[in-house]
Amino acid sequence: ADAAPWLGAMAFRTRVIGAIGDNKYASNVGYMVDNKGNEVYLPVVGEYTSRERGGLHSYDFNVALNFYDRIYLGATIGAYSVDYSRRSFYKESYPGDASTYSLENWFDTSGTGVDFKLGVIIRPFESSSFRIGAAIHTPTWFNLEDRASAIMTSDVDMNSDGTIDKDELYEYDTMDFPGESKTKYELITPWKYNLSLGYTIGRSVALGAEYEYSDYSSAKLKYDDGVKMEDETSQIKTGLKGVHTLRVGAEFKLAPEFSFRVGYNYMTAAMYDDTFKRIALNSISTSTEFSNLKATNNYTVGLGYKGSVFYADL
């Protein structure tokens, strides 16, 4: 039998889509047939809600070396724990007596990861505060487990003459197949490279600039048995690209205890304009939402206070 993603199977079982030929399917919602047999497409009222919690937690273990106050070396082992969950609900309604359907998703990811970071800062001129820095971050090796479940409900009814009416509710729940709702896999993130410059003017002004590059298209996915996730990795390679990040900032000492900070951060887009989320045939995912973020510009300002026993930043 031909493979089909969970989402397609759910839509077929709840009659949201129907077969129109060999391996061909069409939507059964969003239109009505008038008394002349013509299909009349209807305006849709969509409803979407989503709630997320958790995320990525990091724990760093550092060591640093100082050579003559001119060369500074640092190394970090990073450990990560992942605990993320999302609940979403989507519904399409149509005016009049047309059919409706809804999709409710539950998604959880958990796991651990580790990476390594190496960095160096050099003051090339003994009499100057000017400094140059460079750092390299290895990929983060994650071991993750996804758990997904969903319920799709519709009131679509297909008549014997091919017309569609609104009828009793049909429901398809993936929790009826609990053994199929988990995926264990490995994620290997891209390498990251960093260059920085810094300069201090007297005791009142500190200036800094930083450039970072990471090729997101080089990320890789593998199942926990080591087999490469071909479809997903191919989507990463063709849909993502290298990301350039530029950060500049300045700190001004207004008084011995008070400082004022300004900063700017520019990051290029990680995705091509036409990149979208495509669910693999063997994926347990049934959520279609995604964001294709463009280049971002962020501006920051801040105030700081540092006393003998207390400090605060805003």
What positions do the PLM features span?
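Outer-membrane beta-barrel porins/channels
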Residues: A1-L314
